[in-house]
Swiss-Prot record:
Organism for this UniProt entry: Teredinibacter turnerae (strain ATCC 39867 / T7901)
The keyword Ribonucleoprotein belongs to this UniProt entry's keyword annotation: no
Spans annotated as CPSase: 1-193
Enzyme Commission identifier(s): 6.3.5.5
Active site residues per record: C273, H357, E359
Protein name: Carbamoyl phosphate synthase small chain
Length: 386
């Protein structure tokens, strides 16, 4: 039994879903009670990057791969210093964590961040349930467990639709970012050559997105989600990046209004994930809540024009509705899993976006060329201003 292997299993834990389903297991991490929308991620590796992705705010993350924690945790694989997810669900926590960068076990890491987790449950059963019924509200209780209280807590969760979480997870202060990608033996590479001044809106930005922009010569100024467009334009940027983030895009009026102003200024714009949805809304399209969303590192996406297929990392529960695209937007990419819209480009402005994660931390970098297209748009703008 897991309890005999880890020492953490002496503390009982339960996961109760709003439909009344109960999963009994053992506690990892903190004790107490947490609630959120329960989703599943199919990635095999990268559990620390997944946990620290701000897009999981108010969500309990189920990892479908059975062995989680094999490599421990470290200070370099965090996408954000804060864990915004409200819980973690796994099958097995291995006895040993083996990696030359390991500094803390997963159990210790969760405890240090005050995050609840539950292990030793049938994650296959849970995943099938979420696949069939859609994402459900759930409550994890660890320590003194009470099924009735957990069920009441789960059913009291308001859900993510209509919830603006971007302003909650966003930075509160403007700051500079000049760290590039990580390299073995040397750590994060500094900005080598400044080619462009880019303002990045932080709606819950993953650090690896910022690193890949720096790799391409972007000197980044990261601003809070609610920063007015006038303040951004006063910084005289060569381009504006719209980050990923959690929650429903529709309530983010401040972001939609700012993007409209930037579009009117013909500013080169690149959006990822939530940023993609916000660009769609600012351009006149609508968004929808998905049944259980896309969460994983093996999602095939096709380029509509070229037919090229790339394997992508995905993490979203909302999507832009292709049937509502106005004439100024063209669909550029589609999911080969369900046909949902994955990319758009303005036909009249230097602005485009992608639903998946081309920076893929964790996951493949098949779509990294999208960063290069952003560079091309900024180069074209610079050439036209000569």
């Amino acid at each position: 039994m897991l309890a005999q292997l880890t020492g953490a299993g002496k503390v009982p834990a339960i996961l109760v879903l709003e439909d009344g389903s109960v999963f009994r297991g053992v506690s990892i991490g903190a004790t107490g009670k947490s609630v959120g929308e329960v989703v599943f991620n199919t990635s095999i590796t990268g559990y620390q990057e997944i946990l620290t992705d701000p897009s999981y705010a108010r969500q309990i993350v189920t990892l479908t791969y059975p062995h989680i924690g094999n490599t421990g945790t470290n200070s370099e694989d965090e996408e954000c210093k804060t864990i915004w997810a409200t819980g973690l669900v796994i099958r097995d926590l291995p006895l040993l964590a083996s990696n030359f960068r390991n500094s803390q076990s997963l159990d210790q890491y969760l405890s240090s961040k005050n995050i609840l987790g539950i292990a030793d449950i049938d994650t296959r059963r849970l995943t099938r349930l979420l696949r069939d019924k859609g994402a459900l509200a759930g409550c994890i209780m660890a320590g003194d467990v009470d099924e009735a209280e957990a069920l009441e807590t789960a059913r009291g969760f308001a859900g993510l639709q209509g919830m603006d979480l971007a302003k909650e997870v966003s930075t509160k202060d403007t700051y500079q970012w000049r760290d590039g990608s990580w390299k073995l033996g040397s750590g994060y590479a500094p900005l080598a050559e400044k080619r462009f001044n880019v303002v990045a809106y932080d709606y819950g930005a993953k650090s690896n997105i910022l690193r890949m922009l720096v790799d391409r010569g972007c000197d980044l100024t990261v601003v809070p989600a609610q920063t007015p467009a006038a303040d951004v334009l006063a910084m005289n940027p060569d381009g504006v990046f719209l980050s990923n983030g959690p929650g429903d895009p529709e309530p983010c009026d401040y972001a939609i209004d700012a993007i409209k102003v930037l579009l009117n200024e013909n500013m080169p714009i690149f959006g990822i994930c939530l940023g993609h949805q916000l660009l769609a809304l600012a351009s006149g399209a609508k968004t929808i809540k998905m049944k259980f969303g896309h969460h994983g590192g093996n999602h095939p996406v096709q380029n509509v024009k070229t037919g090229e297929v790339m394997i992508t990392s995905q993490n979203h529960g909302f999507a832009a509705d292709e049937s509502t695209l106005p004439d100024c937007l063209e669909a550029t990419h589609k999911s080969l899993f369900d046909g949902s819209l994955q990319g758009i480009h303005r036909t009249d402005k230097p602005a485009f976006s992608f639903q998946g994660h081309p920076e893929a931390s964790p996951g493949p970098h098949d779509a990294a060329e999208l960063f290069d297209h952003f560079i091309e748009l900024m180069q074209q703008r610079a050439a036209s201003n000569v």
